[in-house]
Amino acid sequence: MSVSPIVIKVGGALLDDAAAMTRLFLSVKDVQATRPVVVVHGGGPLVETLMASLGLKSTKIDGLRVTPDEHMPYICGALAGSANKQLCAAALASGLTPVGLSLLDGNMVVCEPLADQYGAVGVPSTADAAFLKSVLAQSTLPIISSIGSSPQGRLLNVNADQAATVIAELLNAELLLLSNVDGVLDGNKALISALNANSIAQYASEGVITDGMKVKVDAALASAESLSRPVYIASWAADITDILNKTTGTQIVPTTLAAENGNAGEI
């Protein structure tokens, strides 16, 4: 793949905003004219609504959803089914050619259970990129849900930020983590332009970066370190080109680049 792909992770709340989905996919269409794009998604709000309607309790530990094995049929249906197909339909309506997938398809990603206390929650790692590269070669838009599988065939629920990170590692791609926030905010709710490991640790110790945002930032930092390139946390309402041009959002900068840049900016 001669041009570096872009992996875009979208939060599940996007599913409740049809106009935002349209804006995002039109922006994707513009970028896809010159670079391959992959979308990875979660669906937390959809899962929570389904769990509540079924009378099933949904809890989190440190921002990660606890997933009993008996909940997996419903979570799999919500993420790999409803959420994935809603996004595929919106992409199709925007003139794209979506292909709905999950982490386990094509042996792209393999997962292991995180820990007993989390239940069927998976830790993903890269496996084989050949299938995904062949899909991208057809000028399609892979839209990948965060449902994975262990080597023994146990379905596992993977945090969507971590799912996007592993797909970016699989393709050596740039990674954008998009949600309904403009980026990482400081204690005064002002946008932080760039963070590295040291500043993340400082903000976390001050209680500024917590819970789901801490999971997001940690996943972004791990990917930035692995890829030796910045990872971007931004709003799905922003233009993708603007994010890549660093005019909006928060860059998560790997240690090597942070050292080269010294103490510039927020780093």
From Swiss-Prot:
Gene3D superfamilies: Acetylglutamate kinase-like. Signal peptide: none annotated. Its main location: cytoplasm. It catalyses: N-acetyl-L-glutamate + ATP = N-acetyl-L-glutamyl 5-phosphate + ADP. HAMAP family: ArgB. GO terms for biological process: arginine biosynthetic process via ornithine; L-arginine biosynthetic process. This is Acetylglutamate kinase. It is found in: Cytoplasm. The record marks 9, 216 as: Transition state stabilizer. It comes from the Bacteria. Substrate binds at residues 43-44, 65, 157. The lineage of its organism: Bacteria, Pseudomonadati, Pseudomonadota, Gammaproteobacteria, Alteromonadales. Keywords: Amino-acid biosynthesis, Arginine biosynthesis, ATP-binding, Cytoplasm, Kinase, Nucleotide-binding, Transferase. Catalyzes the ATP-dependent phosphorylation of N-acetyl-L-glutamate.
